[in-house]
């Protein structure tokens, strides 16, 4: 069971489900748990499990080089059959719970699934395009939450801000995965333009996040609580960008993930407090 939880990246899925809830709370301006929002969060959790598992199925060869002991499929701790079952069941659960909310959420779920399934074979080998695809999908939980409660426009600002951080983080992860990607002939951004230039791009996106995280929420009417809490996320991103400009990737991914969580809390506080 522990290996399965590692395969689906359970902690990341909890963050994604929380992102769906946060999007709903931002949209309604308060903490509430309507059935539609709970179903949307379950759908988001299930679809995230599909994406993570499918990615590992496609990346077994690279993971045997990059993460031989930590990726359950590459380490032989989870069978391909179990992984396929997770993909099938997760797709079914994700679509069913989305369908219990609205047709619009089903369409959003189908769009996310489409990107997930073409990502590894078609998008990931293409510099930047794969990073953009992951950022758009991974940053979308708040939008799904806002969509679930009938106010999709309220989820756009959180989606854009989350996507910026995910985009930078994906480039960092590509830099970390460069040895395995070279082994299987994959052409990611660090391989295409060089590790140094790729990290500069990631740092640039991180630096872009800082003014965006000030201007977009201000224009969207977020309250003062957002700006106080978001300062912590902005500082974390600035530290991460500095390390990237110095050519360092250690702990940068964790810093960016922490900034996402803090940013999510800030966005909710800015509409609820």
Where are these regions (language model features)?
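Multi-pass alpha-helical membrane architecture of UbiA-family
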Residues: 1-273
